[in-house]
């Protein structure tokens, strides 16, 4: 298997894992799932209503379906600070995510 096809297979695997986790989060607690993923209700409805076949087809894209929510270097660096306790890092992360705009269908 070439390096390119191996990388595409890994992207597909990550995509499928992401979509399945997203669906599970949304089915268990829609509001919390939307918050954790930073997505709009419209996008949440699309994700939760995908059939298994649609989910697998979407995961087979050659592009990553998930992305970093923090585009700011300073923000990401502060979240990765090793000097903080786990509880403080989780609280700080939740506060920062709450201030980020949600993704919507374009």
Swiss-Prot record:
Source species, domain of life: Bacteria
GO molecular function: DNA binding
Record keywords, A-Z: Activator, Bacterial flagellum biogenesis, Cytoplasm, Disulfide bond, DNA-binding, Transcription, Transcription regulation
GO biological process, one term: bacterial-type flagellum assembly
GO cellular component: cytoplasm
Main location: cytoplasm
Compartments where located: Cytoplasm
Any Pfam family matching the protein: FlhD
Xref: NCBIfam families: PRK02909.1-1
Family of the protein in this entry: Belongs to the FlhD family.
Free-text note on domains in this protein's UniProt record: The C-terminal region contains a putative helix-turn-helix (HTH) motif, suggesting that this region may bind DNA.
Cross-referenced HAMAP family: FlhD
Subunit architecture: Homodimer; disulfide-linked. Forms a heterohexamer composed of two FlhC and four FlhD subunits. Each FlhC binds a FlhD dimer, forming a heterotrimer, and a hexamer assembles by dimerization of two heterotrimers.
Biological role: Functions in complex with FlhC as a master transcriptional regulator that regulates transcription of several flagellar and non-flagellar operons by binding to their promoter region. Activates expression of class 2 flagellar genes, including fliA, which is a flagellum-specific sigma factor that turns on the class 3 genes. Also regulates genes whose products function in a variety of physiological pathways.
Protein name, entry field: Flagellar transcriptional regulator FlhD
């Amino acid at each position: 298997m070439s390096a390119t096809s191996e990388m595409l297979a890994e992207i597909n695997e990550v995509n499928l894992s992401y979509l399945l986790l997203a669906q599970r989060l949304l089915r268990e607690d829609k509001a919390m799932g939307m918050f954790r993923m930073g997505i709009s209700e419209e996008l949440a409805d699309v994700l939760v209503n995908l059939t298994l076949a649609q989910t697998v087809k979407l995961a087979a894209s050659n592009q990553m379906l998930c992305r970093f929510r923090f585009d700011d270097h300073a923000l990401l660096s502060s979240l990765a600070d090793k000097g903080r306790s786990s509880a403080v890092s989780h609280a700080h992360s939740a506060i920062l995510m709450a201030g980020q705009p949600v993704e919507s269908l374009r």
